[in-house]
Amino acid sequence: MTVMSGENADEASTAPGHPQDGSYPRQADHDDHECCERVVINISGLRFETQLKTLAQFPNTLLGNPKKRMRYFDPLRNEYFFDRNRPSFDAILYYYQSGGRLRRPVNVPLDMFSEEIKFYELGEEAMEKFREDEGFIKEEERPLPEKEYQRQVWLLFEYPESSGPARVIAIVSVMVILISIVIFCLETLPELKDDKDFTGTIHRIDNTTVIYTSNIFTDPFFIVETLCIIWFSFELVVRFFACPSKTDFFKNIMNFIDIVAIIPYFITLGTEIAEQEGNQKGEQATSLAILRVIRLVRVFRIFKLSRHSKGLQILGQTLKASMRELGLLIFFLFIGVILFSSAVYFAEAEEAESHFSSIPDAFWWAVVSMTTVGYGDMYPVTIGGKIVGSLCAIAGVLTIALPVPVIVSNFNYFYHRETEGEEQAQLLHVSSPNLASDSDLSRRSSSTISKSEYMEIEEDMNNSIAHYRQANIRTGNCTTADQNCVNKSKLLTDV
């Protein structure tokens, strides 16, 4: 503990790291003293002692800035007192001692340690590194258009919860998607199926040749499909011209799905027109198999629902984060299929009633056995084959069970991130007695917003920051007047 001389020294002069002016006659002696000067930090009764130069490595933090830490100084005990979590401070002090390495103690929960990082003002960079070390996926920031009108249109179509009209557009979009999927399914019913697939066939009636054609343009299913495509095309074009980056627009998988959803209609329309012209000349323009494959692509419209469903978004994020585990699962299954299909083939080779004519023919049996489906269309009949089948089923259960916990853990992370963000959006969390600096407030006003939750918080500031009184500090999916980017993370407002 450092003892300062002078009985009538004020509080600032008695604080560690704040010597009274003129107390050191020579600058060299002052530097040597400050280099070795120690400071005592009391964390809820547990005292820590370190050198001032250790804290001075990070002057923008609470402990590294003499002015910021002064309000916690106790002149009677000549120490700084913080009524904070004691186990967490071991890691906080190590952050200063190691030059920026942050490690969470195993007995401290994630949320509590995050609060300590915010309280000691270690900075956004330290928080991001901590989240990455803990396995959190780095949040993606999306820029917004610079023009106000373009920005409003983009928010209207991209963020359904940003306003009432945006919700209406989202509801209309979901209804159109559902109608399109229902039409896709209903048109295959035999009682509703048209004979348009047989366009161009020739029927002989009373020794006369008649070319039978069906007009697709009068088909009710085609009319409803056309209305759906008009909406999909309008939505896609508006979002394309309103997006802040045309390159990023085409890189987005959801926009690619939107394009794929409307392409089959225009291809089908072109082929139908070509076939009608071909029928007039007595020839068929397009193969029915090609048309059926093109129509099959329409089923991908169901993925458009993921734009409006948090559950599907969570599932997609889980699969994306679990690609390594899924790759290992497929690799293990591949090895098992090769191994057990070969084993069962040679085990059943001498059996006349064997269902396995070759090793590739046994691939199907190995897959359904390892996945414990067991259709029963192929099965071993010898003792050796049954032993191989038993081992195949056991190996399949173990292989599938290995990566499942990691995938479930990823799902829980994304699910709780969504639900916790909804809870945080209902509260204004105060984690520090310090008001934000001008630079922090201006940085926040440039703002990052969450993609899922919206909340508008209006804080009445005191007279010292009256120029911020009229500012609306928004977190969640709300925007400010000078907002330039969108952050998909969940935010807490610290005042």
UniProtKB/Swiss-Prot annotation:
Topological domains annotated Extracellular: 187-220, 275-287, 346-359, 380-386
Residue numbers bearing the Phosphoserine modification: 23, 322, 437, 439, 446
Tissue distribution: Detected in brain. Expressed in cerebellar cortex basket cell terminals, the area surround the Purkinje cell soma, and the pinceaux expansions encircling the axon initial segment (at protein level). Detected in the juxtaparanodal regions of the nodes of Ranvier in myelinated axons. Detected in the paranodal region in sciatic nerve. Detected on cell bodies in cerebellum, dorsal and ventral cochlear nucleus, pontine reticular nucleus, mesencephalic trigeminal nucleus, motor trigeminal nucleus and the pricipal sensory trigeminal nucleus.
Free-text activity regulation comment from the record: Inhibited by 4-aminopyridine (4-AP), tetraethylammonium (TEA) and dendrotoxin (DTX), but not by charybdotoxin (CTX).
Chief localisation class: membrane
Motif annotated as Selectivity filter, chain positions: 372-377
Observed phenotype of the null mutant: Mice are born at the expected Mendelian rate. After three weeks, mice begin to display episodic eye blinking, twitching of whiskers, forlimb padding, arrested motion and a hyperstartle response. About 50% of the homozygotes die between the third and the fifth week after birth. Surviving mice continue to display spontaneous seizures occurring once or twice every hour throughout adult life. The fecundity of homozygotes is extremely low.
PTM entry text: N-glycosylated. Palmitoylated on Cys-243; which may be required for membrane targeting.
Ranges per topology, Cytoplasmic: 1-164, 243-253, 309-323, 416-495
Motif PDZ-binding, chain ranges: 493-495
Gene Ontology CC terms: anchoring junction; axon; axon initial segment; axon terminus; cell junction; cell surface; cytoplasmic vesicle; cytosol
Annotated membrane topology: Multi-pass membrane protein
Top-level taxon in the UniProt lineage: Eukaryota
Induction comment: Down-regulated by high dietary Mg(2+) levels.
Lipidation (S-palmitoyl cysteine): 243
Residue ranges of the region described as Disordered: 1-30
Intramembrane intervals: 360-371, 372-379
Gene3D superfamilies on file: 1.10.287.70, Potassium Channel Kv1.1, Chain A (3.30.710.10), Voltage-gated potassium channels. Chain C (1.20.120.350)
Quaternary structure and interacting proteins, as annotated: Homotetramer and heterotetramer with other channel-forming alpha subunits, such as KCNA2, KCNA4, KCNA5, KCNA6 and KCNA7. Channel activity is regulated by interaction with the beta subunits KCNAB1 and KCNAB2. Identified in a complex with KCNA2 and KCNAB2. Interacts (via C-terminus) with the PDZ domains of DLG1, DLG2 and DLG4. Interacts with LGI1 within a complex containing LGI1, KCNA4 and KCNAB1. Interacts (via N-terminus) with STX1A; this promotes channel inactivation. Interacts (via N-terminus) with the heterodimer formed by GNB1 and GNG2; this promotes channel inactivation.
PANTHER family: POTASSIUM VOLTAGE-GATED CHANNEL SUBFAMILY A MEMBER 1, VOLTAGE-GATED POTASSIUM CHANNEL
Entry remark concerning the domains of this protein: The cytoplasmic N-terminus is important for tetramerization and for interaction with the beta subunits that promote rapid channel closure.
Remaining remarks: The delay or D-type current observed in hippocampus pyramidal neurons is probably mediated by potassium channels containing KCNA2 plus KCNA1 or other family members. It is activated at about -50 mV, i.e. below the action potential threshold, and is characterized by slow inactivation, extremely slow recovery from inactivation, sensitivity to dendrotoxin (DTX) and to 4-aminopyridine (4-AP).
Family: Belongs to the potassium channel family. A (Shaker) (TC 1.A.1.2) subfamily. Kv1.1/KCNA1 sub-subfamily.
Function (record text): Voltage-gated potassium channel that mediates transmembrane potassium transport in excitable membranes, primarily in the brain and the central nervous system, but also in the kidney. Contributes to the regulation of the membrane potential and nerve signaling, and prevents neuronal hyperexcitability. Forms tetrameric potassium-selective channels through which potassium ions pass in accordance with their electrochemical gradient. The channel alternates between opened and closed conformations in response to the voltage difference across the membrane.
This protein's name: Potassium voltage-gated channel subfamily A member 1
Record organism: Mus musculus (Mouse)
Primary gene name: Kcna1
